Amino acid sequence: EIKFKAFLDFAMQLGASKMATGHFVRTNENGDLLRGIDPNKDQSYFLYMLHQEQLRKAIFPVGGMTKTEVRRIAEENGLPVCKKKDSTGVCFIGERNFRQFLSTYLPAQPGDMVAPDGSVVGHHDGLMYYTLGQRRRLGIGGCGDGRSWFVIGKDLENNRLLVAQGEDHPMLYSTMSIGAEATWIGADPLAGGEPLRCTCKFRYRQGDQPVEVRRDGEKLLIHALTPQRAVTPGQSAVFYQGEKCLGGAIVEQILDAGQGKMDV
C-alpha cells in the first residue's frame, strides 16, 4: 500500500504498461511470485501481500541474477552503486539508529526484567526496544548460573520484560500459532476445506520450515512440524510450495510457547 502499490498506481497514471523494481524475486506468465535465483538475497518474503494482477504489471530484472552478477554489470557500466555496501536498515528510515528513531515518536516506559522464578534481575528501557530471543544489550550481569540471558516474553499489562538463561530455553520454542490478515497471491489454497501442507518462513532468510495450515474462522492455524524458536506476534508467516510463494499472514498469537521443548 505504501510503496509498491503507490508506485504502480502512479506508473499506470502516467500511461506505463509495466513498472520495474530492483527486488530479488521473479515472476512467470501466470503472475506467480517466485523466489529470486540468489538464495541469500531472495526478497519474496517481503512481497507476499501482492496479488497476481499487480505482479503481471511488474518486472524484476535482477531476480534472475545473483548479487555478484548485478554488481559486476553495474561496474562494467560505470555505475557508482557497484561499490555501495548492502543496506541493513529498515527501508523507510534508512541507516539511522532504530532505537533513536522509535524514541522520537514513542515515549519510553522503563520497567523490570523478570526471571522465571519471579525475581527482578534488571531493568529495561521500554518493551518496544526488545524482541523475543534477543540476547545482546540486556545489561544483565552478576546473577544466575553464568549462561547468557535471553528475552522469552513480554508482560504488557505489567510492563515487564520476561528473561531466562540459555538460548534453548523451552519458552523460546513453539509449534502452534494463529495467523491473521491472510493474503494469497493467487487462488486460496484452503478454499476446498482441506489443510495445506507446505513450507513456511517465519522471518527473512530463515530456512524452509514444514508446516500444516488450516482455516480457523477468519484466521489461520499454523502448525509447524518441528519446534520453532522465537516466533513472535507481528512477524509474517510466509508460505511456499517449492519456488512459488503462495502468500502469508501476520502472526497474531503463539498458542504453545514452551510446549515444543528442546533438550537443554
Residue locations for each model-derived region?
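Eukaryotic N-terminal low-complexity, Ser/Thr- and Lys/Arg-rich leader segments
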Residues: 261-264
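Nucleotide-activated chemistry modules centered on ATP-dependent adenylation/adenylyltransferase
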Residues: 1-258
